[in-house]
């Protein structure tokens, strides 16, 4: 199960959205 990789990718996108 590659949940960690997905979580990292989602976390990066969420951080980008919060920065704006």
Curated annotation (Swiss-Prot):
GO terms for biological process: defense response to bacterium. It is found in: Secreted. Its main location: secreted. InterPro entries: Cupiennin (IPR035164). GO terms for cellular component: extracellular region. One of its GO terms (molecular function) is toxin activity. Keywords: Amidation, Oxidation, Secreted, Toxin. Expressed by the venom gland. The modification Glutamic acid 1-amide is found at residue 20. Belongs to the cationic peptide 04 (cupiennin) family. 03 subfamily. This is Short cationic peptide-3a. It comes from Cupiennius salei (American wandering spider).
């Amino acid at each position: 199960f590659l949940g960690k990789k997905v979580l990292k990718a989602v976390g990066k996108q969420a951080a980008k959205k919060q920065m704006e």
